[in-house]
């Protein structure tokens, strides 16, 4: 494969070294476990967390005479993913044997795709920002290919003092290997790419994206060069399993390579591991080339062939993807690009927001979801699937504000009650006497008392009318936030002789 540089060197992404500026080049190979009930070539279950070696068929264990049979759902999931990446779908693809020895690879080879993958070139658009001017930078990252392959088993070295064990539950599980082009120029871009890719496959329902369970992991290829020069020798960092670690691994590896080159050394092409405890990479083995694996077509599997009708049927069934949803939120609901980006970052958040916004003002719903709900979830270490406040409950709080039943301040208190205790917002307001005071007589009495008690402030307001806000705040405080803010403001201005 010939590597093509499509990016213009950008000084703001350069890494300063002792002898001048450097540029980091990043490409990624992401292994995404296909969401399916059974494995790629057998009927064994893919359920996570089952007892060791309980999800294993004769095919997975490579018993003699056991032949692989392709799982149609895995093929469909790969095509769906390719369509979501705006990629070329290859109507004919082949499975190959990738030959290497490892204890948790019972066949002695991995069934993969080499020269003829199921999906060809595509792209992902990532967005960095906002910057100090509130602007976002969109960057297109090329996709080289997507191919299907089997996962290996898992070697376990902590079960016995002198022996290692092998768990084959994962052996034969379908993986999509999504290979990017070397188009990323910083750790931030790489993290944004992984975040966006995970969001896309979750929207599509083709991978759950749970990196902590190994459902999605990345091999990160890193090299450095002087700006504008040819690509340098790359090192591959294997099986990085969190977005934060991807960033840390790239930062460390770029600095390591720069240090070697500035000392007059050369970079060896090798495979490395990232140690998250030390925040550094370490050598694992020399990097293999394709010829080391002796690829050849798998004689037990026919070519995969499908027609336009097959592809179009899958395309017609695709859900709305993050970029399209973001554009719709901005266009139809009047949201800012930032707010829309936050809301579409995860499908579950977008679904929650749309349920709250249905029949309500979109901007108001967005403010409550982003600032109050997501803020509270971050404080408590929960994600959107664990939220104790349902869309119906949050929507009810917004409705109570619109109806004038409660003030914005009381709504914040009500939200915290629902967050901690649950319950129907309207019933809580009634039971706890949280209704907004709309009786102008009661509000006028409070205004008169505050004005009478603060003659000095009255004189200041005459000189500077904007200070009337101080009186509004004092009245709201005196009424426990229950007074209607608009009524308070109108009465304060009238009493102080301030023209509207």
Swiss-Prot record:
**GO BP annotations listed:** glutaminyl-tRNAGln biosynthesis via transamidation; translation
Which reaction equations make up its catalytic activity? L-glutamyl-tRNA(Gln) + L-glutamine + ATP + H2O = L-glutaminyl-tRNA(Gln) + L-glutamate + ADP + phosphate + H(+); L-aspartyl-tRNA(Asn) + L-glutamine + ATP + H2O = L-asparaginyl-tRNA(Asn) + L-glutamate + ADP + phosphate + 2 H(+)
In the record, what terms sit under GO molecular function? asparaginyl-tRNA synthase (glutamine-hydrolyzing) activity; ATP binding; glutaminyl-tRNA synthase (glutamine-hydrolyzing) activity
Signal peptide positions (record): none
Domain of life the protein comes from: Bacteria
Query: What Pfam family is a match for this entry?
Result: GatB_N
Keywords on record = ATP-binding, Ligase, Nucleotide-binding, Protein biosynthesis
This enzyme's EC code(s): 6.3.5.-
Entry keyword annotation includes Protein biosynthesis: yes
**Does Iron-sulfur show up as a keyword for this record?**
no
Family membership: Belongs to the GatB/GatE family. GatB subfamily.
Function, as annotated:
Allows the formation of correctly charged Asn-tRNA(Asn) or Gln-tRNA(Gln) through the transamidation of misacylated Asp-tRNA(Asn) or Glu-tRNA(Gln) in organisms which lack either or both of asparaginyl-tRNA or glutaminyl-tRNA synthetases. The reaction takes place in the presence of glutamine and ATP through an activated phospho-Asp-tRNA(Asn) or phospho-Glu-tRNA(Gln).
Which proteins does it associate with, and in what oligomeric form? Heterotrimer of A, B and C subunits.
Full protein name: Aspartyl/glutamyl-tRNA(Asn/Gln) amidotransferase subunit B
């Amino acid at each position: 494969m010939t590597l093509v540089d499509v990016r213009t060197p950008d000084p703001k992404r350069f890494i300063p070294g002792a002898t001048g500026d450097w540029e980091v080049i990043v490409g990624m190979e992401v292994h995404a476990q296909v969401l399916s009930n059974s494995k790629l070539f057998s009927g064994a279950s893919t359920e996570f967390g089952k007892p060791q070696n309980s999800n294993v068929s004769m095919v997975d264990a490579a018993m003699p005479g056991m032949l692989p049979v392709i799982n149609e759902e895995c093929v469909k999931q790969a095509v769906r993913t390719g369509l979501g990446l705006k990629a070329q779908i290859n109507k004919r693809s082949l499975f190959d044997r990738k030959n290497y020895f490892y204890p948790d690879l019972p066949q002695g080879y991995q069934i993969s795709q080499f020269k003829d993958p199921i999906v060809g070139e595509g792209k992902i658009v990532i967005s960095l920002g906002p910057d100090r001017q509130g602007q976002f930078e969109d960057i297109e990252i090329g996709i080289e290919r997507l191919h299907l392959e089997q996962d290996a088993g898992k070697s376990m070295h902590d079960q016995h003092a002198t022996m290692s064990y092998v768990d084959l539950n994962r052996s034969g599980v379908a993986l999509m290997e999504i290979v990017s082009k070397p188009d990323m120029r910083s750790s931030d871009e790489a993290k944004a790419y992984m975040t966006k890719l995970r969001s896309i496959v979750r929207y599509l329902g083709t991978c759950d994206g749970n990196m902590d369970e190994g459902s999605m992991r990345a091999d990160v290829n890193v090299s450095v060069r002087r700006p504008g020069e040819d690509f340098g020798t790359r090192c591959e960092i294997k099986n990085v399993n969190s977005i934060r670690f991807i960033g840390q691994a790239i930062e460390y590896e770029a600095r390591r390579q720069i240090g070697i080159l500035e000392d007059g050394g050369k970079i060896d092409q090798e495979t490395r591991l990232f140690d998250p405890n030390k925040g550094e990479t370490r050598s694992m083995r020399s990097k293999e080339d394709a010829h080391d694996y002796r690829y050849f077509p798998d004689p037990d599997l026919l070519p995969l062939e499908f027609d336009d009708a097959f592809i179009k049927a899958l395309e017609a069934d695709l859900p709305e993807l993050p970029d399209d949803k973001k554009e719709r939120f901005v266009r139809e609901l009047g949201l800012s690009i930032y707010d829309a980006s936050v809301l579409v970052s995860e499908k579950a958040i977008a679904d929650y927001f749309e349920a709250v916004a249905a029949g309500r003002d979109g901007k108001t719903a967005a403010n409550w979801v982003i600032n109050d709900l997501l803020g509270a979830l971050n404080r408590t270490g929960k994600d959107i699937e664990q939220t104790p406040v349902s869309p119906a409950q949050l929507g009810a709080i917004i409705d109570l504000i619109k109806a004038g039943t409660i003030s914005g301040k009381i709504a914040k208190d009500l939200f915290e009650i629902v967050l901690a205790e649950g319950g129907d917002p309207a019933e809580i307001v009634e039971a706890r006497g949280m209704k907004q005071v709309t009786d102008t007589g009661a509000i006028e009495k409070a205004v008169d008392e505050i004005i009478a008690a603060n003659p000095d402030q009255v004189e200041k307001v005459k000189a500077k009318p904007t200070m009337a806000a101080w009186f509004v705040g004092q009245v709201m405080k005196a009424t426990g936030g229950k007074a209607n803010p608009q009524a308070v403001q109108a009465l304060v201005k009238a009493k102080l002789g301030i023209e509207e």
